[in-house]
Amino acid sequence: MNTPLRAGLIGLGMMGRHHARILSQLPGVQLVAAADSSGDPHHAAANIPVVANVEQLLAHRLDYCVVAVPTADHAQIGFALAAAGIPALIEKPLAPDLATARALAVAFDAAGLIAAVGHTERYNPALRALRARLADGALGTLYQISTRRQGPYPPRVRDVGVVFDLATHDLDVTTWVTGMPLVSLAARTVARSGRIAEDLVVILGELSDGTVTSHLVNWLSPLKERVTTATGANGCLAADTVHGDLTFYANGSAKTEWAAAEVFRGVTEGDITRYAIPKREPLLGEHEAFRDAILGKDAPIVTLWQAAATIAAAEAVLTSATTGGTAAPEQPRIPRPRLASDYALATTDPSSR
């Protein structure tokens, strides 16, 4: 019988409690201990030790660790884990700035360790289906990617604004589903809820092939909305990531005989199809992928370098909002995808750690 991977968790807050739930049930993994200086406010760490800090957590002979603390603390904990030889799954955003994100990526690379960032939307069934259909050419020439992500302010967020906390989802998803980088961004932000950081942003962008992107993100709306729409020559695909639904709106093939209406419509309404797709919890998919990567399997994790590119885009958004002009995201060096054999842990018996 294979020995389960020994996992640790740092942070037992609003997000950490969900990581604890998944880790406690994940096949092939044993959650052995958690760390949080505030204890376990949500009673998420049932029957495992809860220690105060990362140094005490390392005494539990971890095979990997999940980091679910405020963004400002990612660097200190990430560097400690890299120095200790512990692979890490770090919540998004990876870091509060590009320089720190790059430094974390370099640290884990230098140690030969697998590390990933929790861009959970990449595991949303609706977005995975959208990406696959775009790759198959379902829309023909792609014209636009647009997203809407709005809802009430989440009390869990205290150290970053809406750009780093929420818009990073949309910036990452846009480049991931299309396979193209953002090359230009223009944005406007406002702060209306009494916080120093921005709580609403509107972003207009351009991908490397000229595809237009647009993103509406805020913490000010009582309407919770999570929608990604791709529009192309053949129609549009709309992903509702709250419910995991993907709908195709086809351009109609019937000719419009009413000349006056044809002038204004451009395309006609065709068939509407809502696809039946398997719906699995995105966070579970994220953990399964990281577990499999630790075990040396080919798994779709979000690398630290990929996450750093998203940080670069978020910084460009804030630069544009400050200057009133457009900004080009700095493109971090993204190494080739590494093979499992490149990582020290892939050839190490986890039980020996």
Task: Indicate residue ranges for each PLM-predicted region.
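Rossmann-like dinucleotide-binding domain that binds NAD(P)(H)
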Residues: 154-212, 216-223, 229, 305
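Beta-loop-alpha module in the N-terminal Rossmann-like domain of NAD(P)-dependent dehydrogenases
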Residues: 19, 49-107
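Short, Asp-centered acidic motifs that coordinate Mg2+ and/or phosphate
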Residues: 33, 64, 87, 144, ...
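N-terminal Rossmann-like dinucleotide-binding module
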Residues: 1-46
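A contiguous active-site-proximal alpha/beta segment in oxidoreductase catalytic domains
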Residues: 95-157
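Hydrophobic residues in well-ordered beta-strands that form the structural core
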Residues: 90, 115-117, 239
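C-terminal glycine/acidic-rich active-site capping loop/insertion
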Residues: 120, 234-301, 305, 327, ...
